[in-house]
Each structure stands twice: as structure tokens, then as C-alpha cells.
From Swiss-Prot:
This is Transmembrane protein 33. Residues 53-100, 177-247 are cytoplasmic. Belongs to the PER33/POM33 family. It comes from Mus musculus (Mouse). The modification N-acetylalanine is found at A2. Keywords: Acetylation, Endoplasmic reticulum, Immunity, Innate immunity, Membrane, Nucleus, Transmembrane, Transmembrane helix. Residues 2-31, 122-155 are lumenal. One of its GO terms (biological process) is positive regulation of IRE1-mediated unfolded protein response.
Amino acid sequence: MADTTPNGPQGAGAVQFMMTNKLDTAMWLSRLFTVYCSALFVLPLLGLHEAASFYQRALLANALTSALRLHQRLPHFQLSRAFLAQALLEDSCHYLLYSLIFVNSYPVTMSIFPVLLFSLLHAATYTKKVLDAKGSNSLPLLRSFLDKLSTNQQNILKFIACNEIFLMPATVFMLFSGQGSLLQPFIYYRFLTLRYSSRRNPYCRNLFNELRIVVEHIIMKPSCPLFVRRLCLQSIAFISRLAPTVA
């Protein structure tokens, strides 16, 4: 009987595996759609006007995925402060907020990369499970691509964190250029503090520390002008005060 367990990839078949894990399959499909829409925004093969609509579709699909994942993590919804506090600890809640921040804003390529890459990584993980359910030797070329993605996962997560950080000044620039709303930088700052405090994904916090070390190393060189050094040190102190306390 152990060989016929529904969740077991061996012998169950890909379709049976996906039907057994319906919520995971729904998120997999929405992530694939997010990747598709994001790619058509980054590479506007159908024209610039269509690219803007694909930008919105990608963020809406990501919002759906994030909502499904949040429901999976916290299935029993409660209208209480305790539930909200618990939800704000979840990465899926962070990216639900992220999607809502940018879905109606001016399309920015930098803002689509975290959505695209997170969807790609998570879709790749589930695709490997589907392939295992289909057979251990099925589609070797696709498996090779998925293995390469897995090998470069840390670099991809660092790149995502870099985008998350530099979108903060980008939202301020968009505000002064007339392409953003007054509330967007403040809401995005809240998102960034949530990413900084993330328990499951420390890359944003680690990258902040790495950037601070690099900047301090550069400005402490004798060739660095004094006013630049002071400006950088004041900026570092200001950003450090804004950073949330991490347990």
C-alpha cells in the first residue's frame, strides 16, 4: 500500500499528483502565468501598449498567488490584531502588499523582476515534483534547466533583494517626476521593513549590511573627499535609524 500513496511521486502519475495537491497546482499555474506576463512586459514583443497591460496582469496574478499562499499558511482567517500581526510575518503577505503597491502605478521594469524571479523559482520547484510524478527520467532537458535554476538560487535571491532595496529611492524619484503617488513611498517603506524583518528570507537584511560595509570601506579611503564621507556617514546613520529591530 505504501507504493500507492496519492502524494507519492512514484507511480501516481503527474495528473493524479496535481489533482491530489489542488491548491499547490493552482499556485503553480498562476506562477507560470505571472512568468509569462512578466516576460512579455520585459520583452515587449506585442508592442509597448500591450506591454503595459501585461505588467498589470503579472502583478494581479502574483497577488492571486500570494493570497492563495497566505491562505495555505494561515487557513483560519480571523478579524483580529493577532491574526494581522501573524499575517505580516509571512512572505506571501509581503508580496501581496507589493503587488497592490505597483499594480496601478506607472510601469517600472525594476518592480517586475522580484515578481518574475520569485514566480520562476517557486514554479520550478513544483515543476520538478510534477516531473518526478511523471517519471524519474522524464523530460531531461527541462530537468537540466530546473537544476541550473536551483544551483543559482542564492544569486537570484540576492538580485531580488537588490531590486527591493533600490526600488525605495525609485519610488521617491517617481513621486517627484509625477509618475508616482504621494503615499507610494511610505507604503513601500513599510513593505521594505517587512522584508528586512523576514524570518524565512534574510537576503534583504544581509544585503543592507553588505552595502553598508562596502560604502564604509570606500569612504574611509584617504582619497575620498571629506564632504562625501560625512554625507555617506550621515546617510548610513539615518537609514540605520529607520531599520526595524530584528529579534
